[in-house]
């Protein structure tokens, strides 16, 4: 039986995406039957909730998870199926990832469904997404609700100017989804100030935006009242300073790296002057701000090349990524200025900028998983075109191989 019309020109893309998904499935199926890495902390919170109830669990000194209640709520709901045991619990994030791809496809309804879906799966080309998808971590459930918020808010922007029952419903549901995302990862709280700024672009719809903001805060503020802060009380003993420029540099670098895998043309088409200035700035910032002992993809590099050589390679790679990060920041600003009259693009760019800046306040450590939370809006901003089939397939292959290797190193950590 022949492939249906919409898929005929997309055979290569379909084969590549299927291969990447099968690789992810194989990694989960063969994953350890013990909890690994931060799964201990997050499943530990879930078990505390089941034993002690929500309030006591969220305030308990035994809670080593800094995330909110969305993750344990989802895993408790699915516990009759997963029994809170690996590898079954890891399928939850895989399902959330499929949901994210479907929602991103809905954000571009003017295009045929086949290219939209395959383009969404280009996210698997981003190597540091693989641990978040293949393990029972907190990023994907929150990303699913945040992507739902983005879809609803974009529809709100395109809706009628007057506050009709339809726009009220969109604003209410969008706020509810954003609040749920914040309950999954507090990082999404930075989108609320972005919505406040966005009201200057949506003056005729300010009431709808305000409803969205109020509902999102109503959905999540109880948690911060309970904690008397943005994280559990014990977490503040870990964080020592008020900000980290090194984390900001890491964040820009990882956002740039993700863009290179999604759509390198969006980033690389710059004048020579921009590259020269960015290279000087990137290496200077890396020298003064980066920690030599904490390079990008440290686990993979140390496992592959040994401690000393792996750290040296990581520092060089970090300098290159810092350069590209500076270029990424400049390109994002240029895109914002060029599309400043498009409320939908302004919304996406403000949200993206806020999420990329947020790790600067996470001073205890930096993790590439912080950038996973902005991959949905990054995808909507930069796109993932399928036209250059061989280059696209090459990026998917390289990214998936690296992602598989990174996920494997995570599975080796007790």
Regions found by a protein language model. Name each.
Residues 109-110, 149-170, 200-205, 386:
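Membrane-interface transmembrane helices that cradle and orient dolichyl/undecaprenyl
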Residues 119-120, 164-185, 192-197, 215-220, ...:
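Membrane-interface alpha helices of multi-pass inner-membrane proteins
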Residues 36, 131-142, 366-368:
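Short acidic/glycine- and proline-prone juxtamembrane loop motifs at membrane-interface regions
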Residues 91-111, 148-152:
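Transmembrane-helix motifs of polytopic, lipid-linked glycan transferases
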């Amino acid at each position: 039986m022949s492939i249906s019309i919409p898929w005929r020109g997309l055979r290569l893309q379909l084969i590549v995406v299927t291969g990447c998904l099968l690789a992810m499935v194989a990694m989960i199926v063969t994953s350890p039957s013990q909890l690994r890495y931060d799964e201990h902390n997050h499943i530990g919170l879930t078990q505390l909730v089941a034993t002690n109830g929500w309030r006591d669990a969220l305030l308990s000194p035994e809670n080593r998870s800094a995330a909110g209640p969305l993750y344990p709520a989802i895993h408790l709901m699915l516990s009759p199926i997963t029994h809170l045991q690996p590898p079954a619990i890891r399928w939850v994030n895989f399902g959330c990832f499929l949901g994210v791809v479907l929602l991103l496809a809905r954000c571009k309804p003017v295009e045929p469904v086949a290219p939209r879906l395959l383009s969404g799966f280009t996210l698997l080309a981003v190597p540091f997404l693989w641990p978040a998808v293949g393990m029972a971590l907190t990023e994907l459930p929150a990303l699913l609700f945040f992507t739902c918020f983005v879809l609803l808010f974009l529809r709100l922007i395109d809706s009628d100017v007057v506050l009709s029952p339809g726009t009220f419903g969109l604003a209410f549901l969008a706020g509810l989804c954003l609040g749920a995302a914040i309950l999954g990862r507090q990082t999404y709280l930075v989108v609320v100030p972005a919505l406040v700024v966005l009201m200057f672009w949506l003056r005729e719809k300010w009431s709808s935006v305000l409803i969205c903001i109020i509902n999102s805060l109503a959905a999540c503020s109880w948690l911060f009242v309970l904690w008397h802060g943005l994280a559990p009380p014990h977490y503040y003993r870990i964080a020592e300073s008020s900000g980290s420029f090194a984390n900001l540099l890491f964040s820009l670098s990882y956002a740039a790296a993700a863009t290179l895998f999604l759509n390198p043309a969006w980033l690389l088409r710059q004048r020579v002057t921009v590259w020269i200035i960015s290279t000087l700035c990137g290496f200077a910032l890396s020298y003064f701000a980066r920690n030599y002992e904490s390079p990008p993809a440290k686990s993979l590099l140390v496992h592959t090349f040994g401690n000393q050589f792996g750290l040296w390679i990581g520092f060089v790679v970090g300098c290159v990524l810092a350069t590209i990060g500076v270029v990424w920041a400049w390109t994002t600003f240029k895109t914002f200025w060029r599309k400043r009259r498009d409320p939908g693009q302004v919304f996406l760019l403000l949200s993206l900028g806020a999420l990329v800046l947020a790790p600067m306040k996470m001073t205890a450590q930096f993790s590439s998983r912080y950038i996973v939370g902005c991959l949905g809006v990054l995808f909507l901003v930069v796109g993932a075109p399928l036209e250059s089939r061989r280059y696209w397939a090459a990026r998917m292959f390289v990214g998936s191989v690296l992602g598989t290797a990174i996920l494997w190193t995570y599975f080796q950590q007790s």
